[in-house]
Swiss-Prot record:
Region (CaM-binding): 341-364
UniProt keyword annotation of Transport present: no
Name used for this protein in its record: BTB/POZ and TAZ domain-containing protein 4
Free-text domain note: The BTB/POZ domain mediates the interaction with some component of ubiquitin ligase complexes.
Ranges for region Disordered: 14-37
Role of this protein: May act as a substrate-specific adapter of an E3 ubiquitin-protein ligase complex (CUL3-RBX1-BTB) which mediates the ubiquitination and subsequent proteasomal degradation of target proteins.
Organism: Arabidopsis thaliana
Amino acid sequence: MVTGCVDLHQSFKSADSSSVPIPPPLPSKSDGLKKKLGHSSVSTATRDMWDRLFNDGYKADVVIYTDNGSIIYAHANILGTASTVIKGMLKQAKRHGKWHTISIRGVPHDAVRVFIRFLYSSCYEKEEMNEFIMHLLLLSHAYVVPQLKRVCEWHLEHGLLTTENVVDVFQLALLCDFPRLSLISHRMIMKHFNELSATEAWTAMKKSHPFLEKEVRDSVIIEANTRKERMRKRNDQRIYSQLYEAMEALVHICRDGCKTIGPHDKDFKPNHATCNYEACKGLESLIRHFAGCKLRVPGGCVHCKRMWQLLELHSRVCAGSDQCRVPLCRNLKEKMEKQSKKDESRWKLLVKNVLGSKKIGGSPFFLPVTNC
């Protein structure tokens, strides 16, 4: 049974001239070639006639020699019309009486039969396409049959491209100028590199095309490094954003107070409004520890060291130290002048990244990003 045929004509329905014609349907978003592969407007009888002409070889005038000494009979007019390359071969072929003789070797005999049949009727069996997809792809390129080329590409993109054949397809796609197919197969190789690099196909590619194998391997390394760098930047951005929120929460606690913690002159009410700063909870615990820790001198306690760092970061981003109610803000600003250039550069970079993490808007209590 024919499972794949490509349309050669557009079908249409006759309509009553007295009736208003039905408007055509909107274009489908699905792949147009997929629709063509599923049906044909050419009648079954017509397709059968072309297949029968090929199978019976009625008044054939071409002999095609394939591997293992096998022969396929065909018609010069049909082959020459379907492929300009074969047309040129027929012009140069030796003639024995009425017979033209050409050779198509290097692929299985059955693959050549499927190829020649497609030139007649644009049809193929699904099982044959599955079995000879690689050979048909090569033949479509070698003999310039764009229609078969598109069919082969479609089938590979929609199920026939697997980890078992992707290395071979990748090489063939580059050799035969299939840019889209080479991109798709390259992506699959990148995705399954560890599995594919241990296969016989990979070893064969390394032996026959060492530069290509090295290029693919290098691209895998570059992709892995790019992915790591992207992940690192994403993590850094999350940390900078958390630090920015911590700076906002610190100003909020020291200026307005939050629930049970805040300025000494603040009157806290039991029904204090819910805090909108997510960082307040963790920062509240850190401030309480800092206030009561006997080792809170710089470097004396891990938790206190973290608090000192937050206070220094605040002093560097604070826009108004004279009115600021965050402890030690002005003192730490004066301390900056005594720091080494190396430490100063490191802090400036941190400030720039923290302030830059707030892409939209910004706090009026912090310096603008451009001043960092």
